[in-house]
């Protein structure tokens, strides 16, 4: 739809990929929205409180995962497979926690203003897209039976996509409007600095 309506894909990047994806795939956001529009006010308040505290707990757990994964260069994360691509699975998991943490902080702190800050949501969409593409590279390699001739291409693709995810996440933090919160996120997401080159 976004490509047909607009050629630059700005709407697709900022609202469709991140905006709808954040609502539909998040374990708490849709519950919060449904609770807020519940006609039974008392039940809605109870449901909203439960969802909000679940959301906050989810955000804190992702912050902790992101920090410790970054400090250990993703070595504390268990990969689903062993072999030459194991480290890429670990790094994708690290960026997944970092992305979820950054997206939650943005949603909780900016609320509806995040829609107006299209460049922020577009950068988060780019992080999500890079992680998705890296996952597909690894899945294809596994589905093909791990052909040795493909390994250099897999490594190149994963390194490039992880680098792009890092750069977009860093760009998101540089442009986040609440500067003290951006600094806190930077410490938790990139405590060792930018490690992919």
Specify the residue positions occupied by each region the protein language model found.
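Flavin-dependent oxidoreductase catalytic core characteristic
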Residues: 1-197
